[in-house]
């Protein structure tokens, strides 16, 4: 979410302060699959202007530059989902077991639109939550150290007894697969 946070800082300086619900609505209304970036491209590590870095990437790869804020947001969300698919494929090659779903924890688990995009492109369920995974994990480790829970399995049972993660199932995988091919074509130019 680094790309989005940096864009938000620029927009805030320009007097455009968007809440997260507003950002999601903006992404929903933007035209899908118009432009893509590789979120891991080094140019996005700490540019003077994230919006200008995204525009330059699009220009250099022959894509239309985003103009409106909603176009930047949609580009970032779709590009993150496509990058997740690439990384998941790499993990699948080395994992000693088949990966059948993706778990998203922490703050990212609250972004329902990105989680749905991810489920669509990886064509498997995305299980989102808990959003406060670090704090919960810390509590569980302390409970284990105090002898209040026996092992990690008991920790998981306890956590699952009071938290219900959101599950996102794939939708429209055909159009997402076609868009992923376009993403691969664009990002392989760099």
PLM features: residue spans?
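Glycine- and other small-residue-rich loops at beta-strand/loop junctions that grip anionic moieties
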Residues: 107
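Active-site core segments that coordinate phosphate-bearing ligands/cofactors
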Residues: 1-101, 110-134, 140-190
């Amino acid at each position: 979410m680094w790309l989005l946070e940096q864009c938000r800082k620029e927009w805030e300086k320009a007097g455009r302060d968007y809440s997260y619900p507003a950002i999601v609505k903006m992404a929903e209304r933007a035209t899908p699959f118009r432009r893509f970036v590789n979120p891991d491209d080094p140019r996005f590590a700490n540019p003077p202007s994230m919006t200008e870095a995204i525009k330059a990437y699009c220009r250099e790869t022959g894509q239309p530059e985003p103009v409106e804020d909603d176009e930047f947001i949609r580009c970032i969300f779709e590009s993150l989902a496509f990058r997740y698919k690439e990384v998941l494929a790499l993990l699948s090659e080395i994992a000693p077991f088949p990966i059948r779903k993706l778990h998203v924890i922490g703050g990212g688990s609250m972004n329902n639109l990105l989680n749905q995009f991810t489920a669509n492109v990886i064509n498997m369920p995305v299980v989102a939550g808990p959003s406060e995974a670090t704090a919960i994990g810390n509590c569980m480790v302390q409970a284990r150290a105090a002898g209040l829970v026996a092992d990690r399995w008991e920790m998981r049972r306890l956590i699952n007894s009071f938290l219900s993660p959101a599950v996102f199932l794939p939708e429209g995988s055909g159009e997402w697969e076609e868009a992923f091919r376009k993403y691969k074509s664009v990002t392989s130019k760099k």
